[in-house]
Amino acid sequence: MNYEESRAYIRAAELKKGIVLGLDNMRELMRRLGDPQDELKYVHVAGTNGKGSVIAYLYSALSGAGYRVGRYISPAVYSYRERMEVNGEPVSREKFAAYVTRIAEVIDDIVKEGKPHPSVFEIETAAAFLYFQDEKCDIVLMEVGMGGDLDATNIIRTTVLSILVSISMDHTAFLGNTLSEIAEKKAGIIKPDSHMVTVKQQPEAEAVIRRICEEQNVPYEVADRDDAEVLEASMTGQTFLYKGEKYTISLAGAYQKENAVAALRALEILNEQGYPTTQEQRQDGLKRTTWPGRFALLGTKPDFVVDGAHNPAAADMLAASVERYFKGRRIIYIMGMFRDKDYRKVIRKTEKYADTILTIAAPDNPRALSPGELADAVREFHSDVRPYDDIESAVAEAYHLAGTEGVIIAFGSLAFLGDLTEIIKKHNGGNND
């Protein structure tokens, strides 16, 4: 297969198999591929919101310290191949095609034996393991796809460190209807006799994580956002004090302090586990971290911000950031949501800041609410809402409504943020300022 054929193969697999939780298929697939995952060292990250940001901080700091660092994330924002990278370089088209070709041959044998066809995420995760093995990574930063205990990434037997970011209600159809049930699934990545760190969790989630740590003989370590004091914050970044040292980050979201503190606590633990970094490397790593679609300022006059808030907890964080930076300004929203998310709660938590809300849909995505459906839901809470069938028209209208002094905030599913970002860049004459 060439690259285009490998992508077509994956799209076809999506039609055969949707979301699958359980490790039997993955174990069978990886066994036939030679279990490349067993040759690597991992930092495994689970939770509802903040996984990508914490991984971005660690990736920057560890790469800057000279380690060969693999990173596996989903979804990608700009390029599909961003899902698997080593030291800032995405997997090449040729290598990705070769991995998928090899995996497809193994899957043919599996299916001929009457066993289930692996899911898209299982195929992608298998390709990532093959890639990181080939690249001889010193350490791999692995983001859970959904949940934790039964996620395809949890095929790994040991971890250098498990990290739990903020846990809240999401994917309830798969993970459970209470915070305790969801925390149980996500804390399933904690391996016996290993190390873990969690951000400060809600009491129900904390109780579950403490119990699992005790059962697995793992010290319960908390990265507490209250240990950091914000000294200054603007849309271009934040400076905070943590354990007597100053750190600057370029990510503006009010919630980024928590993610940065989680990364710093993780780096302290990794220091003791054979991955030392200096104070300067940690400071430089955090300062250099970029992460698209996380309360990111992509243009000025008007200010144009994009954010991946797609569930109620993320909506709370978005609201806090809007309150911090844009209170009293004229605000236009561009919103796109998936139908399997609690979009009504997202609307309810954010609508009061908007003068006008424009609704769009992620292109060619069956999970996306149509602009009309989303507009109908918004009208339950907000009177000035306008649906747009294409993203470019919505952006043009947002610029018209905002003028030069207003604020445009595009948020919701990351699936449309890549397209949106390209449109904004074009509007700005090809650069981001």
Predicted regions and their residues:
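Beta-strand->loop->alpha-helix junctions that form or flank phosphate-binding loops
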Residues: 73, 199-200, 212-234, 250-254, ...
